[in-house]
Amino acid sequence: MSDPLPAIAYDLFSKIDLRVATVLAAEAHPNADKLLKLKLDDGTPEGRQVCAGVRAWYDPATLVGKQVVIVANLEPRMLRGEVSAGMILAASDLKAEAVIGAEGKPGPEARDVVFLSVDKPVKAGSKVS
């Protein structure tokens, strides 16, 4: 476990917009070995694309339909030529850096990083508090 960060004021935390999103599509990022590119239903008509550094832990095909928790109000950034408009929250207990297996699939320690999710389906775009 990593060392805890210093406490922050509640008003800083209240500025973070946490939402539930549903993964509509997931694929390997074309320009980065460690990233996946995900299309999310975030409750808006246009949805959003997010890039996540979880390629060593997740097979993209297993993510479609999964509900995840996102930081919805991060400014979009370019990650290796692809827009990432938000961040998917994940927990990790990493002992060593994961390595992608021979066939491009996650290695044997596939659960070292896990996405945060909801325990029952909710409407995409639902606020997390």
Spans of model-derived segments:
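Phosphate-backbone binding interfaces of nucleic-acid-interacting proteins
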Residues: 1-129
